[in-house]
Swiss-Prot record:
Broadest EC class assigned to this enzyme: oxidoreductase
Record Pfam families: GFO_IDH_MocA (PF01408), GFO_IDH_MocA_C3 (PF22725)
Domain of life of the native organism: Bacteria
Family from the record: Belongs to the Gfo/Idh/MocA family.
NAD among keywords: yes
GO terms assigned for molecular function: inositol 2-dehydrogenase (NAD+) activity; nucleotide binding
Protein name as it appears in the record: Inositol 2-dehydrogenase
Any one Gene Ontology BP term: inositol catabolic process
Signal peptide: none
Native species: Corynebacterium glutamicum (strain ATCC 13032 / DSM 20300 / JCM 1318 / BCRC 11384 / CCUG 27702 / LMG 3730 / NBRC 12168 / NCIMB 10025 / NRRL B-2784 / 534)
Catalysed reactions listed for this entry: myo-inositol + NAD(+) = scyllo-inosose + NADH + H(+)
Subunit details: Homotetramer.
Task performed by this protein: Involved in the oxidation of myo-inositol (MI) to 2-keto-myo-inositol (2KMI or 2-inosose).
Gene that encodes the chain: iolG
Keyword Oxidoreductase tagged: yes
Length: 337
């Protein structure tokens, strides 16, 4: 494919609008050809950054009009399956924001439907795999330079969350990212999940018990703990420490200007994910567009990865009530090898 890839974005909320801007202004080889959004006001606002894009209220209408070569799904997770199905049936390449679907049962349906095609068509938007620091850490793991990987420690901290943020969202909206990137870093899937509760923050709203410590065991024996804290106040921080046989490595440390003033040491920290993972988002989209042009269609997490994450999230939600919860998964199909 030598022409510019015509991308239809499904969903014109904050994430969809961000992707529209990214594709039209920072991505080569693609442009927004269609905005699929039932809310007229949102669609009109998004269209300001996508001159010439056609407006549709349903993905089926955009497909019937031959308005798209590929689809980017940016609606909430509960609406993913109704968009994925017609897009797959039309044989379109898809980048689907996380999660693939909200549960393993529906994710498995998508996996089974996709296997009727000649190759994987779905890339799931777990953007951390495209972060330069995560890539450097994975290369270190794979090289064996520091010996075997023994343990991973993760920090996932948000300044605050709204009243609508529920207990289960600690897993399904936040730790969901660790359930993808940790197996990718360590080269082994999650086989069990446990949740521990430290002292509850007085800043957590009524009904929310946090922070939590999520403990994962991987199939290769690596143990992982992740601090999930959504009311840390000072900023947004995602960091990982890897413990090897011959040393350790850390990523996600504060960066930028360092200042010493009035007996204090000051350094900048991110305030949200849009700056912490700005490069990752850009690389994710560009890699996907390049893969579609090359005919490989997928350049990152695939639908099977999305299914495994759904299984891990279900175990994590159960673990909020106590116990070590197993994550049982069938072997990866050759289709996704």
């Amino acid at each position: 494919m030598s022409k510019s890839l015509r991308v239809g974005v499904v969903g014109a909320g904050a994430m969809g609008a961000d992707h529209i801007d990214r594709i039209n202004n920072r991505t080569s080889g693609a442009h927004i050809s269609a905005i699929i959004e039932p809310d007229a006001a949102r669609a009109a606002a998004a269209a300001e950054d996508a001159p010439g894009a056609q407006a549709f209220t349903r993905i089926e209408d955009a497909i019937a009009a031959d308005a798209v070569d590929a689809v980017l799904i940016a609606v909430p997770g509960q609406f993913h399956e109704p968009v994925l199905v017609p897009a797959l049936e039309a044989g379109l390449p898809i980048l689907c924001e996380k999660p693939l679907t909200p549960d393993s049962e529906s994710s498995l349906r998508i996996v089974e439907l996709e296997q009727k095609l000649d190759k994987p068509h779905i890339q799931v938007g777990f953007m951390r795999r495209f972060d330069p620091e995560y890539n450097n850490l994975r290369k270190l793991v794979e090289s064996g330079e520091a010996g075997e990987l023994l343990m991973l420690r993760g920090l996932h901290r948000n300044p605050s969350v709204g009243e609508s943020y529920t207990q289960s969202m600690l897993i399904t909206d936040s730790v969901v990212h660790e359930f993808d990137v940790i197996p990718w870093l360590a080269g082994s899937r999650v086989v069990s999940v446990e949740v521990k509760y430290p002292k509850t923050s007085s800043l957590a709203h009524s009904g929310l018990k946090e922070p939590i410590l999520v403990i994962m065991e991987l199939e290769n024996g690596v143990l992982v703990d992740v601090e999930m804290n959504v009311n840390i106040q000072f900023g947004y921080q995602v960091a990982t420490e890897a413990v090897f046989e011959k040393g350790l490595a850390r990523i996600g440390q504060p960066s930028g200007m360092q200042r010493w003033r009035d007996g204090e040491f000051l350094i900048n920290e991110h305030t949200d994910f849009t700056t912490r993972f700005a490069t990752a988002y850009d690389r994710q989209i560009q890699s996907w567009v390049d893969a579609v042009h090359e005919g490989t269609l997928v350049a990152g997490p695939n639908a099977w990865d999305g299914y495994l994450v759904a299984l891990s999230c279900e175990a994590g939600v159960k673990a909020l009530d106590g116990g070590v919860i197993p994550v049982d998964a069938a072997p990866r199909p050759d289709f996704y090898a």
